[in-house]
Structures are given as structure tokens and as C-alpha cells.
Amino acid sequence: SLLNMKYYYLILLFFLIACDENNDDCCPIIDFGQREDLIIENTVFKISYNELKEQPNWIEYTVRDFVKVADRGNMDFYLEKNIKTSDDNDYYNNKWDKGHMAPAGSFTDSWSNLAKTFSFVNCALQVDNLNRGEWRELEEEVRSIARTSGPVKVRIELKFSNSSQVLETGATVPDGFYKFLTFTDNSKQCFYFEN
């Protein structure tokens, strides 16, 4: 009815007057879209992703002996629909590499699995010398163990603190990485890599 319509317009007018542009705290903008513990699982990994930090919290995967059928070639990282992740801008012209958490070289058993490792949800800001050095060497060692002794379960936990660096682009740089290995005999090893 016309009376109801006038009533709604009157309420809207009062609301707009109360929330003028000089009153910033009246109508806060709340972003309900950023999640701190988004669980993503596929045939390669299970991951807890933090959209506020634009980095993983942790990731789990298993390295197995396999026949290589795919090669990374010119594959590059891609964004996931409806997930706020880091992107190419976070890695441009600085010392940070796009560090695979679940390594591409451990999932060349199929093109589909290899491609999944190039999602930005599987990527962390990792100092270049670490990514290309000790981190890569341990990935290769784990593959070697999987070939000779059976599957190796891997869990990586990213360490953040109140003093973690936040880039101008908004992504948070991990302070370090814990890598836990569990072998077929249930023995375990843990490594810590400072970032």
C-alpha cells in the first residue's frame, strides 16, 4: 500500500541522515568473505588456507613411488575461484619465491595431479635461497625414500607471529616452516626452516 511505502521511505531517510559521510563508525563495512581456516582437499593434498594472510596454515600430502608421465614445462601458478590467495604481485621484484608446499616433482604421476600443485593455495612466500636450496634438497630426499622404502606422509605447518612481515600487497610472509615426515614404520622426523 501507499502508506507502507511512505513508511519505508521515511525509515530509509532517517537511516541515511544518521549515517552521513562524516560519521565513519556508524556503518562499518564488514568483509565476511575472508576465512582464516578454509579446508581444501583434492587428490594431491589437504590444506588449511588463511585468506587473511593469503598463505596456507598447514598442508598434508603423501609422497609415493610412481612412474613419471608429466613434466611441469611452462606451467605457472593459477588463482582459485572464490578463494583469496596470494598472486603474482606478491612475488614481483623481491626475494620471495613461489614456494610449492606439495612439490610439483612429487606429483608428476599425472597431468591433473601436477596441475593441482600449481594452485596459489599450494604456494607460500619462501625466501629464494631456501626454496632453491635446502627445501628442494629435502623434497628430493623424500622422493628417494618413497622409491626405496614406501610412502612418506608429509605435514607442513607455516609459522607466523605478531612480527611476521606483511607485504604492501597484503600477503603475510611466514617466519618459517615445520616439515614433519612419517615413514611406513611409523618413525618420524621433523625439520624447521627459517624463512
Where are these regions (language model features)?
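Short, His- and charge-rich active-site/binding loops that engage polyanionic ligands
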Residues: 39-97
